[in-house]
C-alpha cells in the first residue's frame, strides 16, 4: 500500500486556521536583546510576519524624564506597555537645544555699560565726575580754569575772521555802525537758558562777572510768581568776552542743570 504523503502547510496557513485573523504582537527578551514579533498584511493582502530586534541598554536620565515615562497612557494606547509603541511612535534622532538670551549678549557688547569706562568728565579738574559735583567748584582751581578758558575763547574770537570760517553779518565789525542806528548793540549780547526758578540777579552776576565786564543784564521773571522764567540776557562791553562766556558756560552744570548759552538774536524794528 503506497504511503500517504504528508503535505506540510505554511505557518501563515496555520495561523489563519488557528486564529482566523492577525495574532497579537509578542515580545521576548534573551541575552540582553528584545525580540518583537508582529503580523500584518502586505500590499498583496497577504499575512506577513515581522520580527524586530532591539538591543537593551541602560542609561542615566534626568529625574523629570524618568518620571514622565511612568505617566499613565490614555486613548488608544492606554493598554500599551511602558515605552514607545512602534506602531504609534517613531523615535527620531535626539536633538539638543541651547537657549541663548540675545539681550544679555547685547548688554555684554555695549561699550556704554563697560564698568571700566566713565562717560563723565569734570570741566574743572578733569576728574571722572560731573562738574556740578566737583569738590573744587568755586575754589581757586575753578577760577583759574575759567580764566584760561576765557583767554582761549577770546583769542579764538579774535582770530576767527582770519580762519576763513563763516561769520554772521550781525557779528562782523563792519556792522557796528548799522547796529548803532538801532539804539542797542547786540553783538556782545548772549542768551543764557535752562536756568532754575530760584535764579536771582545776584546769582547771574556771580556767574558771569569773572569772564568780563558787563554793560547790562536782564533776568526774565514771571509777572505773577516772580520766579525766574528760565532764561536771561547778558550784554558784555566787548564781543570777545561774550564769545568767551559762550565757550565757558555752554554745557556748564549750574544748580543741578546744564546751561545752554548762545548769541542773542537781534531784534527787528
From Swiss-Prot:
GO terms for molecular function: RNA binding; translation initiation factor activity. GO terms for biological process: formation of cytoplasmic translation initiation complex. Component of the eukaryotic translation initiation factor 3 (eIF-3) complex. The eIF-3 complex interacts with pix. Residues 188-266 form the RRM domain. InterPro entries: eIF3_g (IPR017334), eIF3g_N (IPR024675), eIF3G_RRM (IPR034240), Nucleotide-bd_a/b_plait_sf (IPR012677), RBD_domain_sf (IPR035979), RRM_dom (IPR000504). The keyword RNA-binding applies. It is found in: Cytoplasm. It comes from Drosophila sechellia. Belongs to the eIF-3 subunit G family. SMART domains: RRM. One of its GO terms (cellular component) is eukaryotic 48S preinitiation complex. This is Eukaryotic translation initiation factor 3 subunit G-1. RNA-binding component of the eukaryotic translation initiation factor 3 (eIF-3) complex, which is involved in protein synthesis of a specialized repertoire of mRNAs and, together with other initiation factors, stimulates binding of mRNA and methionyl-tRNAi to the 40S ribosome. The eIF-3 complex specifically targets and initiates translation of a subset of mRNAs involved in cell proliferation. This subunit can bind 18S rRNA. Keywords: Cytoplasm, Initiation factor, Protein biosynthesis, RNA-binding. The keyword Methyltransferase does not apply. SUPFAM superfamilies: RNA-binding domain, RBD (SSF54928).
Amino acid at each position: 500500500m503506497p504511503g500517504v504523503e504528508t503535505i506540510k502547510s505554511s505557518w501563515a496557513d496555520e495561523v489563519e486556521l488557528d486564529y482566523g485573523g492577525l495574532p497579537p504582537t509578542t515580545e521576548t527578551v534573551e541575552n540582553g536583546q528584545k525580540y518583537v514579533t508582529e503580523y500584518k498584511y502586505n500590499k498583496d493582502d497577504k499575512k506577513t510576519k515581522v520580527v524586530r530586534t532591539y538591543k537593551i541598554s541602560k542609561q542615566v536620565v534626568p529625574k523629570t524624564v524618568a518620571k514622565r515615562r511612568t505617566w499613565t497612557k490614555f486613548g488608544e494606547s492606554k493598554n500599551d506597555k511602558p515605552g514607545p509603541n512602534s506602531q504609534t511612535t517613531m523615535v527620531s534622532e535626539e536633538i539638543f537645544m541651547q537657549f541663548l538670551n540675545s539681550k544679555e549678549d547685547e548688554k555684554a557688547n555695549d561699550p556704554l555699560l563697560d564698568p571700566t569706562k566713565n562717560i563723565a568728565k569734570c570741566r574743572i579738574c578733569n576728574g571722572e565726575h560731573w562738574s556740578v559735583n566737583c569738590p573744587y567748584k568755586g575754589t581757586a582751581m575753578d577760577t583759574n580754569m575759567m580764566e584760561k578758558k576765557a583767554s582761549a575763547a577770546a583769542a579764538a574770537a579774535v582770530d576767527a575772521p582770519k580762519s576763513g570760517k563763516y561769520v554772521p553779518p550781525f557779528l562782523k565789525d563792519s556792522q557796528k555802525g548799522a547796529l548803532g542806528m538801532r539804539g542797542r548793540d547786540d553783538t556782545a549780547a548772549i542768551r543764557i537758558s535752562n536756568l532754575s526758578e530760584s535764579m536771582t540777579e545776584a546769582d547771574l552776576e556771580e556767574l558771569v562777572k569773572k569772564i568780563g565786564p558787563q554793560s547790562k543784564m536782564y533776568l526774565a521773571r514771571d509777572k505773577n510768581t516772580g520766579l525766574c522764567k528760565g532764561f536771561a540776557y547778558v550784554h558784555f562791553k566787548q564781543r570777545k568776552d561774550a564769545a568767551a562766556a559762550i565757550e565757558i558756560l555752554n554745557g556748564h552744570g549750574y544748580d543741578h542743570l546744564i546751561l545752554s548759552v548762545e548769541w542773542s538774536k537781534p531784534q527787528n524794528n
